[in-house]
């Protein structure tokens, strides 16, 4: 199979469909045939009125927007999963690999507000809609006198709820607003030093099956019918990997690897009040990282520069080490690994 049809799995939200269609258009421009399959995840169902959240799952939990898509990928029903990179755990399941990280959109956070031009103009006691522990902690470090309200749903739903007066302001990722053309109410794009983005924010992750057969569980009969024989599936996956790899952006891949290495070394999952952002100028990589106590009262902030050529994981580990030396684990109430 030299040029197989690439089946893309995606969530059904407006933003997820935009992202999947964007990737599909790039693949088609390279001469590939593409199909989309919409997959409903437990994270999507948790936003339905009356849905009972399964025990052990949190609306902010790691993996709630990816499990069903990964299940379809492992079973051979799809060939490519398009995720927001920040939704993926730092430890990738061995059954899968990240084939490509396309060029990144704006990684910053956006401040949405109608009557005030920025965070510092809000009156004391104003309400801000965000459920992200990172955004809440970093906002409290800047404005300890504001309050937070819970607001869930996709971008359009949150913008509608905000416009109805359910909060004075709203914080969303710039990337999503830019992709959907919903920037009319963005009055401030926070600087990297004000609200350091979540590791990988603004980047897409193109996830495929691993080519290492020993990483796969023995397939069920129905899965063999879907994916063909093992040899045929391996040949097919190899061709698909090569097609998708053409969409990779080396600078975005490096930056996000360094950012995610910080989170991985600190431990504790993607819902920590931790931000990391890497960019490159000339021959130097710059990695910004920030950890904030949940109440916003204590901040550990690092900017580390290293020459181009330094492995991304080494850069991330070094910055994590510096954060830990500044008390990051205590701020986050994380037990050191050697004590576990």
List PLM regions with ranges.
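Ordered, amphipathic secondary-structure segments that act as subunit-interaction surfaces
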Residues: 75-87, 209-211, 240
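Paired acidic/hydrophobic, glycine-rich loop segments that form the ligand-binding mouth/hinge
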Residues: 70, 79-83, 168-173
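Small-molecule-sensing regulatory modules
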Residues: 2-49, 55-58, 141-214, 223-229, ...
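Short, well-ordered beta-strand segments
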Residues: 7-9, 37, 81, 99, ...
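A conserved helix-loop-strand patch within extracytoplasmic ligand-binding domains
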Residues: 85-88, 92-145, 209
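Short, structured active-site "lid" loops
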Residues: 49-80
């Amino acid at each position: 199979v030299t040029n197989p049809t690439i089946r893309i799995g995606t969530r059904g939200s407006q933003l997820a469909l935009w992202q999947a269609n964007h990737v599909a258009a790039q693949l088609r421009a390279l001469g590939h045939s593409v199909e989309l399959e919409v997959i409903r995840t437990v994270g999507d169902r948790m936003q339905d009125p009356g849905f009972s959240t399964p025990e052990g799952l949190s609306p902010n939990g790691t993996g709630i927007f990816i499990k069903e898509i990964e299940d379809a990928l492992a079973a051979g029903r799809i060939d490519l999963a398009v995720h927001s990179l920040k939704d993926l755990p730092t430890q990738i399941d061995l059954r899968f690999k990240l084939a490509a990280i396309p060029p990144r959109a704006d990684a910053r956070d956006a401040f949405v507000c109608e009557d005030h031009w920025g965070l510092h103009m809000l009156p004391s006691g104003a309400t801000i809609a965000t459920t992200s522990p990172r955004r809440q902690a970093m906002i409290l470090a800047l404005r300890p006198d504001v309050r937070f309200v819970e607001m869930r749903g996709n971008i359009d739903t949150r913008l509608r709820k905000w416009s109805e007066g359910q909060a004075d302001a709203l914080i969303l990722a710039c990337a999503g607003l830019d992709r959907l053309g919903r920037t009319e109410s963005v009055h401030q794009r926070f600087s990297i030093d004000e609200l350091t983005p979540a590791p990988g924010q603004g980047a897409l992750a193109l996830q495929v099956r691993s080519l290492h057969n020993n990483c796969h569980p023995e397939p069920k009969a129905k899965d063999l019918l879907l994916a063909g024989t093992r040899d045929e599936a391996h040949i097919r996956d190899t061709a698909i990997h090569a097609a998708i790899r053409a969409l990779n952006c080396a600078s975005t891949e490096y930056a996000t690897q360094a950012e995610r290495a910080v989170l991985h070394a600190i431990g504790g999952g993607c819902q920590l009040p931790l931000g990391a952002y890497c960019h490159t100028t000339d021959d130097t990589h710059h990695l910004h990282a920030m950890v904030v106590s949940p109440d916003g009262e204590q901040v550990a902030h690092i900017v580390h520069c290293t020459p181009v050529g330094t492995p991304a994981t080494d850069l991330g580990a070094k910055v994590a080490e510096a954060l830990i030396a500044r008390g990051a684990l205590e701020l986050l109430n994380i037990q050191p690994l050697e004590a576990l």
